[in-house]
Curated annotation (Swiss-Prot):
The protein, known as: Thymidylate kinase
Known role: Phosphorylation of dTMP to form dTDP in both de novo and salvage pathways of dTTP synthesis.
Alphabetically ordered keywords of this record: ATP-binding, Kinase, Nucleotide biosynthesis, Nucleotide-binding, Transferase
Top EC group: transferase
Matches recorded under HAMAP family: Thymidylate_kinase (MF_00165)
Amino acid sequence: MARGKFITFEGIDGAGKTTHLSWFRERLEQKVASTGRSVVMTREPGGTPLGEQIREIVLHQKMDLETEALLMFALRRQHLAEVIEPALARGDWVLSDRFTDATFAYQGGGRGLPRDKLETLERWVQGGFQPDLTVLFDLAPEIANERRSAARDPDRFESESVAFFNRTRAEYLRRAEEAPYRFAIIDSAQSIVQIQRKLEELIAIL
């Protein structure tokens, strides 16, 4: 069986990516049902037993910026070794709620960690490995902030300022501009129906 495909969903908090991920998974499962492949859904930070434990620390405990970035990449290495790479080798499809682009956007763009440090970690942890498709849900931080305000217990990223998310969004868009061959940008200000129509178009060409 041919190697599977790796698809990531990205966007600032409040952009709606997680809401649409489950719907996308259902449609993708319908597409691959006759091929004997499975669809694996995962997330970052997290995705493994170790990752889920440390996820709570990363999301809720204040820490040094470089420690934060190192933890993200350490968890990613385990995620790749334990979940992503084995699934792709089996021929399965993997959907991940965030991956490396989030680290460049949040720790790089948002927090200001130098890009060269992140690129060094990326090369060490991933080699040349990248997603086959990254769906970026793009939304103005002011609108995303209104959506996030409904969250009952926001984590320390969700609690960041609009200025932080402006920087994060800008870095996401920079990443997309540098790798247009794997990015699909969706305007999250659209209606759910319009967004799902765009996602259907992506599934059709996978």
